[in-house]
Amino acid sequence: MSLQMPIPRKKALTVSHFSITLSLFLAFFISSTSASTNEVSALISWLHSSNSPPPSVFSGWNPSDSDPCQWPYITCSSSDNKLVTEINVVSVQLALPFPPNISSFTSLQKLVISNTNLTGAISSEIGDCSELIVIDLSSNSLVGEIPSSLGKLKNLQELCLNSNGLTGKIPPELGDCVSLKNLEIFDNYLSENLPLELGKISTLESIRAGGNSELSGKIPEEIGNCRNLKVLGLAATKISGSLPVSLGQLSKLQSLSVYSTMLSGEIPKELGNCSELINLFLYDNDLSGTLPKELGKLQNLEKMLLWQNNLHGPIPEEIGFMKSLNAIDLSMNYFSGTIPKSFGNLSNLQELMLSSNNITGSIPSILSNCTKLVQFQIDANQISGLIPPEIGLLKELNIFLGWQNKLEGNIPDELAGCQNLQALDLSQNYLTGSLPAGLFQLRNLTKLLLISNAISGVIPLEIGNCTSLVRLRLVNNRITGEIPKGIGFLQNLSFLDLSENNLSGPVPLEISNCRQLQMLNLSNNTLQGYLPLSLSSLTKLQVLDVSSNDLTGKIPDSLGHLISLNRLILSKNSFNGEIPSSLGHCTNLQLLDLSSNNISGTIPEELFDIQDLDIALNLSWNSLDGFIPERISALNRLSVLDISHNMLSGDLSALSGLENLVSLNISHNRFSGYLPDSKVFRQLIGAEMEGNNGLCSKGFRSCFVSNSSQLTTQRGVHSHRLRIAIGLLISVTAVLAVLGVLAVIRAKQMIRDDNDSETGENLWTWQFTPFQKLNFTVEHVLKCLVEGNVIGKGCSGIVYKAEMPNREVIAVKKLWPVTVPNLNEKTKSSGVRDSFSAEVKTLGSIRHKNIVRFLGCCWNKNTRLLMYDYMSNGSLGSLLHERSGVCSLGWEVRYKIILGAAQGLAYLHHDCVPPIVHRDIKANNILIGPDFEPYIGDFGLAKLVDDGDFARSSNTIAGSYGYIAPEYGYSMKITEKSDVYSYGVVVLEVLTGKQPIDPTIPDGLHIVDWVKKIRDIQVIDQGLQARPESEVEEMMQTLGVALLCINPIPEDRPTMKDVAAMLSEICQEREESMKVDGCSGSCNNGRERGKDDSTSSVMQQTAKYLRSSSTSFSASSLLYSSSSSATSNVRPNLK
């Protein structure tokens, strides 16, 4: 018998408690293990959600692990549950979509997947991760909208979604993130308004929403409730309206960055209450009114950038009390009054930029207290008086731009104290006195421009010490003495222009040591002696101009070694001897002018080996003799030939092959024989042929005689002929009466027949005038005028593509029918005013590499045909807007087209006599050749400037819709400046990829108004924005030139010659600036989005120096507005 002992009650309770505890532990363990397993599964699933294998750095992610806590980039909680609290992946190229099962991570506090090429949309499930404190998904390729479910995250402190492709609005639900401190959503494609609900987040310290070009509306007044806000960045958006007064409540605000937007109204004086403000960036807006003096209370402000607004009035003295300021930029406004003397209190000031205002008075000497000043730019104002010698105390000064003012007196010797000076431009002032020798002791000086002053004295011998010089321009002064031999020490000099002075003595041999020289202009001085043989060592020289001096001796044979030379101008000197045959080796020569010398001998045949000689060959006013060599016909591209006032003899048959000649002068020689029966000779006037007694035209025994005996003989012949003429007159009158009756009958017949035939081929003989050597006939052309060959229609006619029997393809423009007189000499002289006569008159007289080649014309009663070279790539308009591959039109090609078109238009305006106004510049009238070279075409509305009715109203609208200059609407006047405006519109079209009136431009704005409002890199064609920084810089500088061209005031627009010069120097200036800055701040090859970066704002700065048509700005302002490292420091991209 067994006895069962009873269990005590206390022990039974203990066993029961243990059992419950064990059950709970097991349940928790199983639950925790299950959660960890789910997280492992979720991470592995995400890692393999792409077809590409995951990066090797994720090899430690083992799907067999029970939890991911030991995996790279993963952090778990310290408790026993081992749940993921952090996912931190930065700068690893994942190329994965956003984690689809993000809600699996219930304890996640920090989600950082930045700069990993994360794709897809942000899942709304992210709002279920209620523990999240930090979300950083910046610098990826995310698309779609920002999930409104983020508003559920009450613990969220940082939300960084910047630099993605997010669209849609900023969700108002973000206002429910009551713990949010940093909101960074800049550089996306967000739109609509900034939610006023953000004003509910009292913890907010940073709002950065810039770079969203469609973000619009006003800055909400409620932002003033975010009392902890330190950064407000809304740059490069469409934010409009006024700055809210409530911003003055933000006492902790450190950076206000709302540049390149559509802000208007006045700067609120309440900003003076933001006592912690460090950066105030409001440039490139439409702000108006005066600068509030209350800003003077901002003792912590370091940078105040307000350039390119409409601010006016005096600059308050109180600004000088902001002792922390290191950068002030008030350029491109309408400030008046003087430079405040209180600026002398700004001991930390590094940059003071006041360019392009209406500032008067003198430069305060007290600015010398600003000992840290690096840039001082006061150009394009009305500043007068002396340059204070105290400026020389600024030891850190790099750049001093004071051009286009009213400065007077001497350049102070004390400027030599600016030991770090790199660029000094004081052009277009009233400076006198001599050049300070100390300037040439500055070992960092690269550019010295003193154009158009009244500087006298000699060039100091110390010039040889300034070995850093790249550009030296002393044009149009009163400098005397000799050119110092020490100039030969300037090994970096590429541009030397000493023209229009009173220099004397020889051209120094030592100048040949400047091996980098590309341009040497010593013209319009009184230099004597020989031209140095050693100039041949300047193998990079492109322009050599020593005209209008007193140089003697022979032209050196060694000039033939200058293989890069394209312009050689030796005119108006006393050179003797023969023309060296070695010049034939200068194969790049386009212009050769040896006129007005004492050159003798024959014309060397070797000159005719220069195939590029297409602008001019001028050998006039010399003592050349002999025959014209037959080989001269090889210069088939030559436009101007002047061999007048020599002793040349023989016949002129050799000249008949020069089919492209526009101007020919053979007067005052000893030519004989008949004039060739070619176009250029038929167009010569008497003054261009006179003085050749033996020269005759076919059908006459003598044509150009001028001695008295021959004139007496002519009088006798004339008397005899007069008697015969009277006898014939009676007979002819009777015949004409009969013919008159027949003509009336015939006219009625023709009118009736004309209604049945557009061409009237059977009624009127076709007239054919070729301007080139053509291998086809009118009949060949007419056969091609069928509907299937039409390639375009315009306001002046239809354009056909025509293939000739010899497989040559040409373009034929058939002008719209209009009955006009036959274009015989009589009607030409009377000035027919239709598109045919205008275009023939214009195109037949010009030659330029960027103007479409006019082959010839043919016409009859009412059909008029113009023939051109056919352009295989069509027009610029079709390239930009009608082809799917527009993005493949790279910057190099676009720049080439812009520059070439400018050069062609400059030729029309400045090199044609008389000047020619195109009147219809547009993208469709710029044709594109096989190598993407541009050609200006369609002169259907062209008028010559000296036409009597040129400036009066025209019955035909001059120009095309979208391109017409604004002054035409009220004055109906067309000038060269009208062409400049139209060209500016074309440049905007090329840069933006948009048409002048484009449906994609918001609010129906014209491209000009749109660009002026945006004025940022955002206007650049999307296909170009990813180009290297150096190219983007060139685009923005080109945009600055375009803004000059579209100035609403015609007088303030540059000439096309200046435009072409500016564009030509953009690349060159950038290269030189890299030398100046040591590649500081401008040699980066890329842009890391989201970091402080100066690219776009530096480009904005370029525009402000493009406001003057001064020739000096192209040599300095373009460079120093865009490449200075100091400038870069004050253009942060705080979006």
UniProtKB/Swiss-Prot annotation:
The segment annotated Disordered runs over 1077-1135
Q: Which residues carry this modification: Phosphotyrosine?
A: Y868, Y907, Y963, Y970
LRR repeats sit at 105-129, 130-153, 154-177, 179-203, 226-250, 251-274, 276-298, 299-323, 325-345, 346-370, 372-395, 397-418, 419-442, 444-466, 467-490, 491-514, 516-538, 539-562, 564-586, 587-610, 612-634, 635-658, 659-683
What keywords are annotated for this sequence in UniProt? ATP-binding, Disulfide bond, Glycoprotein, Kinase, Leucine-rich repeat, Membrane, Nucleotide-binding, Phosphoprotein, Receptor, Repeat, Serine/threonine-protein kinase, Signal, Transferase, Transmembrane, Transmembrane helix, Ubl conjugation
List where the protein spans the membrane.
Answer: 724-744
| Cystine pairings recorded for this chain | C69-C76
- Annotated GO MF terms: ATP binding; peptide binding; peptide receptor activity; protein serine kinase activity; protein serine/threonine kinase activity
Query: Where does the motif Small peptide recognition lie?
Result: 186-187, 208-211, 231-236, 259, 281-283, 329-332, 351-353, 399-403, 425-428, 447-451, 471-473
The residue range of the signal peptide is 1-35
Q: List modified residues, type Phosphothreonine.
A: T777
Q: Which effects follow disruption of this gene?
A: Smaller root meristem size and fewer root meristematic cortex cells, associated with shorter roots and a slighty reduced sensitivity to RGF1. Quintuple mutants rgi1 rgi2 rgi3 rgi4 rgi5 display a consistent short primary root phenotype with a small size of meristem associated with a total insensitivity to RGF1 and undetectable levels of PLT1 and PLT2. The triple mutant missing RGI1, RGI2 and RGI3 is insensitive to externally applied RGF peptides (e.g.
Q: Taking every annotated instance into account, which residue ranges of this chain make up the domain Protein kinase?
A: 785-1066
Q: Which residues lie on this side of the membrane: Cytoplasmic?
A: 745-1135
Task: Name the residue ranges with Low complexity bias.
Answer: 1108-1128
Look at the named UniProt entry and state the broad enzyme category this protein falls under.
transferase
Family matches, as SUPFAM superfamilies: Protein kinase-like (PK-like), RNI-like
Extracellular compartment segments? 36-723
Positions marked as site (Essential for autophosphorylation activity): K813
Q: Some GO term, biological process aspect, for this entry: which one?
A: maintenance of root meristem identity
Name of the protein in its database record: LRR receptor-like serine/threonine-protein kinase RGI2
What is the species of this protein? Arabidopsis thaliana
Q: Which gene encodes it?
A: RGI2
